[in-house]
Design a protein with these regions (language model features):
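Short, flexible loop segments at boundaries between secondary-structure elements
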Residues: 138-151, 155-159, 289-303
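Small-molecule pocket liners
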Residues: 36, 132, 150-151, 159-162
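Contiguous, glycine/small-aliphatic-enriched amphipathic segments in soluble metabolic enzymes
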Residues: 1-134, 176-265, 269-283, 289-292, ...
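A broadly tuned "polar low-complexity/structure-edge" signature
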Residues: 133-140, 164
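Ligand-binding beta-strand-loop-alpha-helix segment within the catalytic cores
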Residues: 154-184
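A broad structural signal for alpha-helix termini and local helix breaks/kinks
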Residues: 49, 139-145, 168, 197
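Detector for methionine-enriched segments
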Residues: 1, 152-153, 168, 265
Length: 340
């Protein structure tokens, strides 16, 4: 059976999304496995230097992918690279919503999202902290083949790191963390490692919140009161979860041999090691959704947009990983008779 194409979203049209989409197509155009279409105003992709062909039927994308970028057209305001405006907010969200619909309806194998500028969207009334939460809302009425999310995971440099908390001030993290949050997030990561990454018996390492994982309570109680009790419950469920590990030694090469993924307690704790090890090739994944979603692990880069300076490494990695996850998920659901 012919593989379904992937679908890319526009992201902010004033950012580097259009440029890296063109560069990703140039790198992948001869590999039909990674065929995609982008949902965008056609003129924006053309302005980034892309050879485009408008399609209405997503299934046509693989047939024309080698010769042109398949574009599913939507309306949009005129846009200048490097000059974002909230007037484009509707185009940005429409691209995301249509991509989600096409993936939920089985037309696309997965969605790959280009970077958005949340502050620009907020000016137009956008009410979600980011892509992760927005996608969770758009798909909330559909079943996932494992525990529902959404959970943010970063992949790169041989690491897979999920986050217990995402976009919040550091001072709020300790107040937000609780046993239930860790249990839910860990269960989703465990399910994703099995379903989306094909790891039969995944090992999950839990990072401590405090320096030296609290040093037996001398530097904080969260490990004793929250993280370790959660780990004990997870182990009773058959999930191979460690007690809280000191985050300063958790990511070196020898430590990485002892786990398949890390559950970090806050945003920078998880993202710094991934971006340090693989700054250009990291991928953002949303776990626990009924659809497969990946994204490049960088922002809109308005300062270099339209200057042919942007690297497409992360988007290319996101496209390849989206295809791999979609294939793994299909295999898992078929083998285990799971409906998604």
């Amino acid at each position: 059976m012919r593989a379904k194409p992937l679908v890319l979203t526009l992201g902010d049209p004033a950012g580097i999304g259009p440029e890296i989409t063109v560069k990703a197509w140039e790198a992948l155009r001869h590999q039909k496995t990674y065929a995609f279409a982008i949902i965008a105003p056609e003129n924006i992709i053309s302005a980034a230097g892309g050879k485009t062909q408008i399609i209405e039927d997503l299934s046509r994308a693989p047939d024309i992918f080698e010769s042109a970028i398949p574009v599913i057209p939507i309306a949009g305001q005129s846009s200048t690279f490097g000059n974002p405006t909230c007037q484009n907010a509707k185009t940005v969200t429409q691209s995301i919503e249509l991509a989600v619909t096409k993936t939920l309806e089985g037309e696309a194998a997965a969605i790959v999202t280009n970077p958005i500028a949340k502050d620009i969207l907020y000016e137009a009334g956008f009410k979600f902290p980011g892509h992760t939460e927005y996608l969770g809302e758009l798909t909330k009425n559909h079943a996932c083949p494992y525990t529902r999310g959404p959970v943010m995971m970063l992949s790169g440099g041989g690491l897979k790191v999920g986050l217990a908390t995402i976009h919040m001030a550091l001072k709020e993290v300790a107040q937000t963390l609780n046993i239930d949050t860790i249990l839910t997030t860990a269960r989703i990561i465990d399910g994703a490692l099995k379903c989306d990454f094909g790891i039969e018996t995944p090992r999950l390492s839990l990072a401590g919140l405090n320096p030296h994982a609290g040093e037996s309570g001398a530097l904080g109680q969260e490990e004793i009161d929250i993280i370790n009790p959660a780990a004990k419950i997870l182990r009773s469920e058959g999930i191979l979860a460690s007690d809280a590990q000191s985050a300063d030694t958790l990511f070196h090469s020898e430590a990485r041999k002892t786990y398949d993924a890390v559950l970090a307690m806050y945003h920078d704790q998880g993202l710094i090691p991934v971006k340090t090890l693989d700054f250009h090739g990291g991928v953002n994944i949303t776990l626990g959704l009924p659809i497969v979603r990946t994204s490049p692990d960088h922002g809109t880069a308005f300062d270099i947009a339209g200057q042919n300076k942007a690297r497409a490494d992360s988007l290319i990695a996101a496209i390849k990983l989206a295809r791999n996850i979609a294939t793994n998920r299909d295999d898992y659901t078929s083998k285990n008779h799971v409906s998604g």
